[in-house]
Amino acid sequence: MASYDKISDGWYRVCPKRSSNRALITVKLPFSTLFRLKPMTDITPFANRLGKNIKHLMKWAKRNGIEAWRIYDRDIPQFPFAADVYGDRIHLQEYDTGWLMRPEEYEAWLAEVLEAVAFVTGFAPEQIRLKRRERQKGLQQYEKTGKAGDDFVITENGRKFWVNLDKYLDTGLFLDHRNTRKKVGETAAGKRFLNLFSYTGSFTVYAATGGAASSETVDLSNTYLDWAKRNFELNGIDTERHKIVRADVFQYLQTAYGEGRRFDLIVMDPPSFSNSKKMSDILDIQRDHKKLIDGAVKLLASDGILYFSNNLRSFVLDDLVSEQYAVKDISKQSVPEDFRNKKIHRCWEIRHKS
């Protein structure tokens, strides 16, 4: 159960206990004014939208060999959820809205949502994993939930990946980058590939299985590099030609350039912010992206391509980047069909100017 802190007559903060296996709401008051959310007692609009999305996307997912795909993307504001199919399970994320609700109203509302998801999808309740995403800075994908869960394999475009819906806030595979992964796989043949801020190495899996001559997969987290290694093994990737490198990306860029290493294809998908103690400095992508892009382009072959992406909503690409390099915004093409929110990330194709 959660703890309830009384604010005033009839109003409460709902705070989850760490041991709870349900994701309950935590309300922070940004202003002195309180406001009520009109309870959405009718679950029908949510259920109908969920059913409509599944009907539209299920054949598409099967046709494309995709076992992990989004079936609901905060389509209706009163139901602020993202729901993803992962094989025979559902990953359901509730987003923090700052709403104030009475405890009993919230519990009833959440139970209705879960019941609707189970009914419409046909998945058993125990196959649905519920999480709550708070508004906060930092490397959310590196944060543990306190649950162990189990690892299992899903398939995407003929590649296999280990995922875990319980242990971390993120699952091990960012579904919104599916299109860019596919593009990398289609263009990597014979090329030297570099994956920066690699997370679990999914871009490298596409590059290696797409015929890349060699690759380097760079991240600072041992946990996620071990995960990447398992993904490589799952797809029969030779770790002699496709190396895994634990390093601070800023330091790696300097070292690799000094050693004369060059790459034909680079992917860089950094977090918006990181204060990891393992890094030499705090990463702020708005402040630091020009330095990162400059360092990556130095490693590009004359006809090479850098794909640079991030998910900071307020992000603005430095004008100097477009002045110095040939830059193409490919954000629209990079967001998959199953994502309603076409601003979930931004992505650019960056080359040397001819």
From Swiss-Prot:
Main location: cytoplasm
Pfam families referenced in this protein's UniProt entry, alphabetically: Methyltrans_SAM
InterPro entries membership: SAM-dep_methyl-trfase (IPR019614), SAM-dependent_MTases_sf (IPR029063)
EC number: 2.1.1.264
GO CC term (a single one): cytoplasm
GO term, biological process aspect, one: rRNA processing
Catalysed reactions, as listed in the record: guanosine(2069) in 23S rRNA + S-adenosyl-L-methionine = N(2)-methylguanosine(2069) in 23S rRNA + S-adenosyl-L-homocysteine + H(+)
Keywords, sorted A to Z: Cytoplasm, Methyltransferase, RNA-binding, rRNA processing, S-adenosyl-L-methionine, Transferase
Biological role: Specifically methylates the guanine in position 2069 (m7G2069) of 23S rRNA.
Family statement: Belongs to the methyltransferase superfamily.
Protein known as: Ribosomal RNA large subunit methyltransferase K
Organism: Neisseria meningitidis serogroup B (strain ATCC BAA-335 / MC58)
